[in-house]
From Swiss-Prot:
May be involved in transcriptional regulation. A zinc finger (C2H2-type) spans 722-744, 750-772. This is Zinc finger and BTB domain-containing protein 10. It is found in: Nucleus. The gene is ZBTB10. Keywords: DNA-binding, Isopeptide bond, Metal-binding, Methylation, Nucleus, Phosphoprotein, Repeat, Transcription, Transcription regulation, Ubl conjugation, Zinc, Zinc-finger. GO terms for cellular component: chromosome, telomeric region; nucleoplasm; nucleus. Its main location: nucleus. GO terms for molecular function: DNA-binding transcription repressor activity, RNA polymerase II-specific; RNA polymerase II transcription regulatory region sequence-specific DNA binding; telomeric DNA binding; zinc ion binding. It comes from Homo sapiens (Human). SUPFAM superfamilies: beta-beta-alpha zinc fingers, POZ domain.
Length: 871
């Protein structure tokens, strides 16, 4: 194969479009020289597209220039080849041998043809426009044409190519091997003829990159030189770094905007991680992958629009709720009144540092004195947590620059204030059975409504616990862990709140088959019947009597048992083997009388000193119940135990410290009072008011007469089951007793919605709310003046319900003054007195209610010895 044939094939493959060296069968060769391209090859080729109406020559010039080229002689072409090759050598570093001279024509020197052929190939690869050498039939003896200038890619300059590449990076998107363009016009498929020759038409171009000096884009491949053969062309390769940038059509900021978005770098596809659930995550296999194909189409702006549309869809929000619920960890070790704070938070660290400063006395600017004990603290912490301290330190004594750094509080609950102070510095409120009342009292005094409400919920849960017939036989309340334990030892669910610190007395489990003979009263009890006196008296486990012998390391529990069978007794005995349990026993005080005619056997329990209390130990047998007194002569008729166990031998009195209350024997040789079993199936034991001044209530069987006439002529059978543990007030209804207890606790649980002032009664809040209203509804009945406050209307030493103002009360005018102006009273000197008398008035009203409840004329005379417990 000659060098000229190699040159032709190389030029045809590179697409340079050079004028060949020898004439032949070219369409533009009139001399009939050799064709510029190699002969047709047997490889498959694409069918040639229809020729355009006016096909431009390879170099993009017109018909005049083509005629001019045809008129050139071969000598002219050879003469022009030398300088062109030299210029190209200076512009590009050619791979020439070291012993070779400068580039010459085909006939210059021994190595001239080889160097010229290599020069032609290099120029054809670099610029695509080198002139042909040798005998060209189309030249007609004219000089050889000059080599084309250096062209980049499709004939454009370096600056143009750089600008186009920079613009192409932001517009064209390569994905899955295809080009995604922002252009709204339809791109023509195939190759287009650029500004180069027809053989160069294989370069890919979009509608914005149509090359040439006004050249038209044509589908298919260009027509090469020769006998109309089509030449297979290849698109020009782009830099690898540019292709990587074009393929990256995903924005990393989308992952922050849409947390549900999942992106695959391998496939370039996006999907929703919440809507598309795999079978491992609990999703269905039949469900199509939602959002896998829909979110991967279009341009970048269109994709983000699809993401936003999917984000606000209803179906996605449903999956979003389920995904968020699954991410929330389950809470273990739930506690109602004490939650563990986040130790890594700034707030926790700040409070801990302030608490350490308080304990060490650093920068403490106030001393709080409570019952002689001094507490160091910071004013800013106290003001931030208590409305009382805020009023004390911020709104009072503004005229004195040097305020007193010592504050005395008129409260006696030292332990309660210590808990409140720890709460202000830690955020944790520690409530136990011993300090709940004190903490609530101190919080009410300091006007901390949230703490008061928490204490109320704590106490309310305790009051709601009662021993009923359907209740379990044994309940253990562990105050250290504050978790209930059933009889089988299993802990109940966390939502069950056990916070009881009131001991509910229970009359239960008298001895089975007990034969009692005393003064003609013979009763044979055939079966065990439980009588329950619910909430008859409350005993606080934190009282001094209860706390005398309690050690700090012991677990305090209350146990209510039903000892009806031997099997239950054995189970309870096994469970309580290693426990220190508290037992509550009703007290029967002594009396000097020597007979049982009155049958007054007991009165409401009173906390007796431990040294005067006879204690009973629990034994597994229930055959008999006998209690020996100090003189040892007699046996008590029956004993009443809240957690009743009896002595097996029936004669030993226990000396253990497990029992705080016991049966008190009389000083005489005879035991005058005891429990007498009844004969009725409905009520075994009932309370009846006694005739003696010492004992008002006693137990007697139902078979006795239901009405008795005593010395004072009163007759009734009533059981006053609700008695105040702090005073002698006895209520008939539970709600009345709760209102009465507010007098002793001093809890101000009702607050004004406008100013936040606390009150003990709801009616006091309603009356106080009139102060904030513009309506003046308080009018003096004498002078007809209208006042803003109810405290301004009232007699000085009487109740303000009479509606007489202070001035009229001082003047003691019986008549009225009709013509006095109905002006607003701007001064209210009795406001402080009104606030001070609020609690006193509540006391008067509650005492009146108590007197009405104890009125014998209003007692229930239905004939029942024991009233219903569910009033």
């Amino acid at each position: 194969m000659s060098f000229s044939e190699m040159n032709r094939r190389t030029l045809a493959f590179r697409g340079g479009g050079l004028v060949t060296a020898s004439g032949g069968g070219s369409t533009n060769n009139n001399a009939g020289g050799e064709a510029s391209a190699w002969p047709p090859q047997p490889q498959p080729r694409q069918p040639p597209p229809p020729a355009p109406p006016a096909l431009q020559p390879p170099n993009g010039r017109g018909a005049d220039e083509e005629v001019e080229l045809e008129g050139l002689e071969p000598q002219d072409l050879e003469a022009s080849a030398g300088p062109a090759a030299g210029a190209a050598e200076e512009a590009k570093e050619l791979l020439l041998p070291q012993d070779a001279g400068g580039p010459t024509s085909l006939g210059g020197g021994a190595g001239g043809p080889l160097l010229a052929e290599r020069n032609r190939r290099t120029l054809a690869f670099r610029g695509g426009g080198g002139g042909g050498l040798g005998n060209n039939g189309s030249s007609r003896g004219r000089p050889e044409t000059s080599v084309w200038p250096l062209r980049h890619f499709n004939g454009r300059g370096p600056a143009t190519v750089d600008l186009e590449l920079d613009a192409l990076e932001g517009k064209e998107l390569m994905q899955d091997g295809a080009s995604l363009s922002d252009s709204t016009e339809d791109e023509e498929e195939g190759a287009s003829l650029g500004d180069g020759s027809g053989a160069e038409g294989g370069s890919c171009s979009s509608s914005r990159r149509s090359g040439g000096d006004g050249g038209d884009e044509v589908e298919g491949s260009g027509v090469g030189a020769g006998e109309g053969e089509t030449v297979q062309h290849f698109p020009l390769a782009r830099p690898k770094s540019l292709m990587q940038k074009l393929q990256c059509s995903f924005q990393t900021s989308w992952l922050k905007d849409f947390p549900w978005l999942r992106y695959s770098k391998d496939t370039g596809l996006m999907s929703c991680g919440w809507c598309q659930k795999t079978p491992a995550d609990g999703g269905s296999v039949d469900l199509p992958p939602v959002g896998h194909d829909e979110l991967s189409r279009g341009t970048r702006n269109y994709k983000k629009t699809l993401l936003l549309r999917h984000h606000v869809s209803t179906e996605h929000k449903l999956h979003e709720a389920n995904a968020q619920e699954s991410e929330i960890p389950s809470e273990e070790g739930y506690c109602d009144f004490n939650s563990r704070p986040n130790e890594n938070s700034y707030c926790y660290q700040l409070l801990r540092q302030l608490n350490e400063q308080r304990k060490k006395g650093i920068l403490c600017d106030v001393s709080i004195v409570v019952s002689g004990k001094i507490f160091k603290a910071h004013k800013n912490i106290l003001v931030a947590g208590s409305r009382f301290f805020k009023t004390l330190y911020c709104f009072s004594n503004k005229e004195s620059p040097n305020q007193n750094n010592t504050t005395h509080l008129d409260i006696a609950a030292v332990q309660g204030f210590s808990v409140i102070l720890d709460f202000l510095y830690s955020g944790n409120l520690v409530l136990t059975s011993q300090n709940a009342i004190e903490v609530m009292t101190v919080a009410s005094y300091l006007q901390m409504s949230e703490v008061v409400q928490t204490c109320r919920n704590f106490i309310k849960d305790a009051l709601n616990i009662s021993i009923k017939s359907e209740a379990p036989e044994s309940v253990v309340v562990d105050y250290n862990n504050r978790k209930p334990v059933n009889r089988d030892g299993l802990s109940s669910s966390r939502d069950q709140k056990i916070a009881s610190f009131w001991a509910t007395r229970n009359l239960t489990n008298l001895a089975s088959n007990v034969k009692i003979e005393n003064d003609g009263c013979n009763v044979d009890e055939g079966q065990i019947e439980n009588y329950q006196m619910n909430d008859s008296s409350w005993v606080q486990d934190g009282s001094p009597e209860m706390a005398e012998n309690e050690s700090e390391g012991q677990t305090k529990v209350f146990i209510w048992n039903n000892m009806g069978s031997q099997g239950i007794q054995e189970t309870g005995k096994t469970r309580r083997k290693n426990q220190t349990t508290k037992r509550f026993i009703y007290n029967i005080p002594p009396n000097n009388e020597t007979n049982l005619e009155d049958c007054s056997v007991m009165q409401p329990p009173v906390a007796y000193p431990e040294e005067n209390t006879l204690l009973i130990k629990e034994e597994p047998d229930l055959d008999g119940a006998l209690l020996s007194g100090p003189d040892g002569d007699r046996n008590v008729n029956a004993n009443l135990l809240a957690e009743a166990g009896t002595s097996q031998d029936g004669g030993d009195a226990g000396t253990s410290h497990d029992f705080k209350y016991g049966l008190m024997p009389g000083p005489s040789n005879d035991f005058k009072y005891g429990l007498i079993p009844g004969t009725s199936n409905d009520f075994k034991y009932g309370l009846i008011p006694g005739a003696s001044n010492d004992f008002k209530y006693g137990l007697l069987p139902e078979s006795w007469p239901k009405q008795e006439t005593w010395e004072n002529g009163e007759s009734s059978l009533i059981m006053n089951k609700l008695k105040c543990p702090h005073c002698s007030y006895v209520a008939k209804y539970r709600r009345t007793l709760k209102r009465h207890l507010l007098i002793h606790t001093g809890v101000r649980s009702f607050s004004c919605d406008i100013c936040g002032k606390l009150f003990t009664r709801r009616e006091h809040v309603k009356r106080h709310s009139l102060v904030h209203k513009k309506d003046k509804k308080y009018k003096c009945m004498v002078c007809k003046k209208i006042f803003m406050l109810a405290a301004s209307v009232g007699i000085r030493h009487g109740s303000r319900r009479y509606g007489v103002c202070v001035d009229c009360a001082d003047k003691s005018q019986p008549g009225g003054q009709e013509g006095v102006d109905q002006g607003q009273d701007t001064e209210f000197p009795r406001d402080e007195e009104y606030e001070e008398n609020e609690v006193g008035e509540a006391d008067e009203e509650l005492v009146d209610d108590g007197e009405d409840q104890n009125d014998p004329s209003r007692w229930d005379e239905s004939g029942e010895v024991c009233m219903s417990l569910d009033d």
